[in-house]
């Protein structure tokens, strides 16, 4: 079952997200997600198997320019994760479908996402979910 996540699910979301975004901590993610949930332009979904959380997705509405799109707002997949041992069961596809339905309900005509250039698993997932590649970029920074 896929369902919308609520404030009571913040601990579950933060723990799942920390498995994907290992550069962050559960506490930081809990705080960030708590702040994000107060905004109406973002939604989290949880995937449950036998009432056990096994995955999540985070989607948003983007009003700024999104690479390769032509409309505003654009639904955007900010993150998607399914625990090892529960993968290849179609759960990520279910989570994505929930995000797409949410975005469509919010008036979006396009849905977009991104992934790190070396994340082959994510690239393959996006291709399998009928995303088309719109661009590749390299980001730069320097200290001032």
Regions found by a protein language model. Give the residues of each.
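Helix-loop element at the rim of GNAT/NAT acetyltransferase active sites that forms part
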Residues: 14-28, 65
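Conserved acetyl-CoA binding element of GNAT-fold acetyltransferases
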Residues: 71-84, 138-139
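Conserved acetyl-CoA pyrophosphate-binding loop and the N-cap/start of the following alpha-helix
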Residues: 86, 90-98
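Conserved active-site alpha-helix within GNAT-family acetyltransferase domains
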Residues: 93, 105, 117-136
């Amino acid at each position: 079952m896929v369902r919308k996540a609520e404030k009571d699910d913040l601990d579950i979301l933060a723990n799942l997200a920390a498995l994907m975004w290992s550069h962050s901590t559960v506490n930081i993610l809990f705080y960030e997600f708590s702040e994000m949930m107060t905004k109406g332009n973002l939604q989290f979904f949880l995937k449950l198997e036998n009432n056990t959380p096994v995955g999540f997705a985070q989607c948003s509405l983007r009003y700024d320019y999104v690479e390769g799109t032509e409309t505003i707002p654009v639904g955007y997949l900010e993150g998607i994760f399914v625990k090892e041992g529960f993968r290849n069961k179609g759960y990520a596809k279910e989570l994505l479908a929930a995000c797409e339905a949410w975005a469509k309900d919010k008036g979006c005509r396009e849905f977009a996402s991104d992934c790190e250039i070396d994340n082959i698993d994510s690239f393959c997932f996006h291709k399998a979910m009928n995303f088309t590649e719109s661009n590749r970029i390299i980001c730069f920074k320097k200290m001032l």
